[in-house]
């Protein structure tokens, strides 16, 4: 027994020694709280980001599953191109057999250079934490270079776990000079923004042109009924397609993939059949000599025909835009192993058929199908066309949703149709506008040849924009060697410039349509973003002074009412100018008041545990806080009850930590969790809280097992315990517990949302153009867009509005 007591005392002495060692390290590593709280920082919590290693590696089974799904989502558009490429390339007739070989050679090397080399092996790597598309490129660039037109950057944002991309090379003076030039030039920022919204507008325009050309081409298989009947049937299919959008595409990957895979099997198999039956010698087209000979023979007409050849790569941008649903390896495997071989066989087979029947060029695809397979192929072709249309329509919805998050599009209703597939959204207003536009295009153009003229411009324009933006990313983000940047830029821009010049030649024959549509969208997006920026600048210049808050705290006429008030503003720093208007109209304040700013970051997603930032608004006893809620452009806004729960849990954790800092004296540091995978605090329901405690310093503990089960005594006599997830925290002092209980009681009394309705007008001294843009164009868009409360998912029964006029 004595031995046991001795061992126990010895253990206690050893534990005490270890505890003192821990305390000494805390003292050695202490951080001055006064120095840490920068003017531009919200709180210490902003600097505590998850140390979780984001594992982007996916096992081969998951990759194969994603590969299969990607076939149905990504390749419908490029897969249906064989329906109309030869018809668009030879609108009149085929001059000679050598011309067929020349066009086939052009198609082969266009497929090799643009989709395969450029996109599959280069552009896909320029993703924004797994997301692709023009906005993703802009967002990626915005995180490395301050090119955003809205000055709401915070140091805390750069510390998010998804914010930074690992740079593959050493820093170079060249990239720093380019970065400095871009950050200091307002014109470059505006140009980059305009190029971005031009690219997104073109992709949205594809949501109109793809359904038209794909469905018309597929239905043309029953051309014996006459062109008017084909147009009528196509319009009926399109109406059904758009009306079905509200049902969602939850099973899009697995349900569409078998059909598109069957389609590629059909076109590849039929192509091989025609190749061996009619003329296997067309494989000579792999020799680029036939491509150059084609231009020598045909001159200007050969150049014009490139507008049809480029349709072979329609849908290439979808590989990049839809990357967020899959991964790079899945796209690379599916394109290289299935799509590319099937397309080569299809085009080679059609070329072999045309060498024997050149007069059938206007119906190449259907004429080349063996009779027993005609109707099965027709059915699968219509299904593939619908799927291709579906993918582009869904892509248009996703892009507009991203635009909304970045303040570049009027507020519209966004419905998330899938809990499983992120980014699957439905926008009713946009859906019916696209449907009407599709019907008008079908009625106006009637043939795939004219629609192809319009389609080509949209396809090539987006490719040119992608080339330019990836080049900038190579310079600034990747810091690639100049020789490789030169090869990439000049190699692809020359090819795309030739194609662009060809499709622009057909401007009057339908090419004006995507440009007009994109210009219209750019005006809407530009006006909305401009006012969004100016509103933010107005609030920043007119934010409430600290003296006003102090006077308010001392004002006996201001009543405190039970509950939590959430006052929404776009400001990430300071108290918004709408607050005095609330006080003037309603001379009372809730027992807990939180100034909430919804901030969209230039990244696809923000982890839930990194979403909330808090800071106390002095005086402390007044219980006023600021909160920045950060979302990525693919994040969905939570339901009110869940949002309130997350915010209150985060606020209580902030209060706990504030008291730990203020009461801890020298021990102003907390330790690193032993397991970085579990750095979030857990609520009672076992779910990660929205606002987690993150660690600033690593603490090497002499005996983790003993420390985790025991206590650490600081010099002040305060006992701090170490939780199961490795976080050393102080026990709640009376004031902290009381304040947290006040917050909890206030939540139980109810949460009220306070929303300022700003009427934006131009200053009297503004130009006539600015007055028209602000007073008429913007206000027309605002009146016809969705209310801010609905966009933020604020329950109407608990919403209080106060109006104010902003002169910008």
Swiss-Prot record:
Please name the InterPro entries in this protein's record: K+_transporter, K_trans_C, K_trans_N
List cellular component terms (GO).
membrane; plasma membrane
- Organ and tissue specificity: Expressed in the roots.
Q: Give membrane topology per the record.
A: Multi-pass membrane protein
- The residue spans the entry assigns to the Extracellular side of the membrane are as follows 87-102, 211-221, 273-302, 349-379, 446-456, 504-510
What does it catalyze? K(+)(in) = K(+)(out)
Q: Indicate where this protein resides in the cell.
A: Cell membrane
Gene Ontology process terms (BP): positive regulation of response to salt stress; potassium ion transport
Q: Which GO terms describe its molecular function?
A: potassium ion transmembrane transporter activity
- In the UniProt record, does the keyword Membrane occur? yes
Membrane topology (Cytoplasmic): 1-65, 124-189, 243-251, 324-327, 401-424, 478-482, 532-808
Spell out the residue ranges making up region: Disordered. Answer: 699-722
Q: What is its main location?
A: membrane
Kindly summarize what the UniProt induction comment says about this protein's expression: In roots, induced under potassium starvation and salt stress.
Q: Which residues cross the membrane?
A: 66-86, 103-123, 190-210, 222-242, 252-272, 303-323, 328-348, 380-400, 425-445, 457-477, 483-503, 511-531
- Which keywords has UniProt assigned to this entry? Cell membrane, Ion transport, Membrane, Potassium, Potassium transport, Stress response, Transmembrane, Transmembrane helix, Transport
- Which family does the record assign? Belongs to the HAK/KUP transporter (TC 2.A.72.3) family.
Q: What does this protein do?
A: High-affinity potassium transporter that functions under low potassium conditions. Involved in the positive regulation of salt tolerance under salt stress.
Q: What name does UniProt use for this protein?
A: Potassium transporter 5
Q: Which organism is it from?
A: Manihot esculenta (Cassava)
């Amino acid at each position: 027994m004595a031995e046991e007591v001795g061992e126990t005392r010895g253990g206690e002495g050893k534990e005490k020694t270890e505890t003192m060692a821990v305390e000494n390290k805390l003292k050695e590593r202490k951080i001055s709280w006064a120095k840490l709280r920068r003017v531009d920082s919200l709180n210490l919590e902003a600097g505590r980001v998850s140390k979780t290693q984001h594992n982007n590696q996916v096992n081969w089974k998951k990759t194969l599953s994603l590969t299969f799904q990607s076939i149905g989502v990504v390749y419908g558009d490029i897969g249906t191109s064989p329906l109309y490429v030869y018809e668009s390339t030879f609108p009149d007739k085929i001059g000679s057999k050598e011309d067929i070989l020349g066009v086939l050679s052009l198609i082969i090397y266009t497929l090799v250079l643009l989709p395969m080399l450029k996109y599959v092996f280069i552009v896909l790597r320029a993703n924004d934490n797994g997301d692709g598309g023009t906005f993703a490129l802009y967002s990626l660039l915005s995180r490395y270079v301050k090119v955003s037109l809205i000055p709401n950057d915070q140091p805390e944002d750069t510390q998010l776990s998804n914010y930074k991309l690992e740079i593959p090379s050493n820093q170079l003076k060249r990239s720093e000079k380019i970065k400095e030039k871009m950050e200091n030039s307002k014109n470059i920022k505006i140009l980059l923004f305009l190029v971005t919204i031009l690219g997104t507008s073109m992709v949205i325009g594809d949501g109109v042109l793809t359904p038209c050309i794909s469905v018309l081409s597929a239905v043309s298989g029953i051309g014996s009924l006459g062109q008017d009947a084909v147009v009528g049937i196509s319009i009926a299919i399109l109406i059904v397609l758009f009306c079905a959008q509200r049902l969602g595409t939850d099973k899009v990957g697995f349900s569409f993939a078998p059909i598109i895979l069957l389609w590629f099997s059909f076109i590849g198999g039929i192509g091989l059949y025609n190749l061996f039956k009619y003329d296997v010698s067309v494989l000579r087209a792999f020799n680029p000599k036939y491509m150059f000979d084609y231009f020598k023979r045909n001159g200007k007409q050969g150049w014009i025909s490139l507008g049809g050849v480029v349709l072979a790569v329609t849908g290439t941008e979808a590989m990049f835009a839809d990357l967020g649903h899959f991964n790079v390896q899945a796209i690379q495997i599916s394109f290289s192993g299935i799509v590319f071989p099937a397309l080569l066989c299809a085009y080679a087979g059609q070329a072999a058929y045309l060498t024997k029947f050149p007069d059938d060029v206007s119906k190449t695809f259907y004429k080349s199908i063996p009779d027993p397979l005609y109707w099965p192929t027709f059915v699968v072709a219509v299904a593939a066309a619908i799927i291709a249309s579906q993918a582009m329509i869904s892509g248009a919805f996703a892009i507009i949703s991203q635009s909304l998050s970045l303040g570049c599009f009027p507020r519209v209703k966004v419905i998330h149709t899938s809990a499983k597939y992120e980014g699957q959204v439905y926008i009713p207003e946009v859906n019916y506008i696209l449907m009407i536009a599709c019907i008008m295009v079908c009625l106006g153009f009637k043939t795939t040849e004219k629609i192809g003229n319009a389609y080509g411009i949209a396809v090539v324009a987006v490719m040119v924009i992608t080339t330019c933006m990836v080049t900038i990313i190579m310079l600034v983000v990747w810091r690639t060697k100049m020789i490789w940047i030169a090869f990439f830029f000049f190699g692809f821009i020359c090819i795309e410039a030739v194609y662009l010049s060809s499709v622009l030649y057909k401007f009057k024959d339908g090419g004006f349509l995507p440009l007009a549509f994109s210009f219209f969208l750019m005006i809407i997006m530009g006006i909305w973003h401009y006012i969004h920026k100016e509103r933010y600048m107005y609030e920043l210049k007119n934010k409430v002074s600290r003296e006003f808050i102090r006077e308010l705290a001392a004002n006996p006429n201001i009543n405190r009412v039970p509950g939590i008030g959430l006052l929404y503003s776009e400001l990430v720093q300071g108290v918004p100018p709408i607050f005095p208007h609330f006080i003037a109209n309603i001379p009372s304040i809730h027992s807990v008041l939180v100034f909430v700013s919804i901030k969209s970051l230039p990244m696809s997603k923000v982890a839930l545990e990194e979403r909330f930032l808090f800071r106390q608004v002095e005086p402390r006893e007044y219980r006023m806080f600021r909160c920045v809620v950060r979302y990525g452009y693919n994040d969905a806004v939570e339901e009110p009850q869940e949002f309130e729960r997350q915010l209150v849990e985060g606020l209580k954790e902030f209060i706990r930590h504030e008291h730990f800092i203020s009461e801890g004296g020298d021990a102003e540091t907390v330790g690193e969790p032993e397991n970085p995978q579990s750095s979030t605090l857990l609520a009672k329901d076992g779910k990660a809280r929205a606002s987690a405690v993150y660690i600033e310093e690593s603490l090497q503990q002499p005996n983790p097992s003993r420390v985790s089960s025991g206590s650490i005594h600081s010099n002040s006599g305060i006992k701090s315990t170490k939780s199961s997830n490795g976080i050393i925290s102080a026990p709640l002092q009376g004031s902290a517990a009381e304040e947290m209980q006040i917050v909890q009681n206030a939540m139980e009394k109810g949460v009220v949302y306070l929303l300022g309705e700003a009427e934006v007008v131009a200053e009297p001294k503004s130009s006539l153009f600015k007055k028209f843009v602000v007073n008429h164009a913007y206000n027309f868009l605002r009146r016809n867009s969705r209310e801010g409360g609905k966009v933020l998912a604020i329950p109407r029964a608990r919403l209080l509005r106060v109006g104010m006029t902003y002169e910008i």
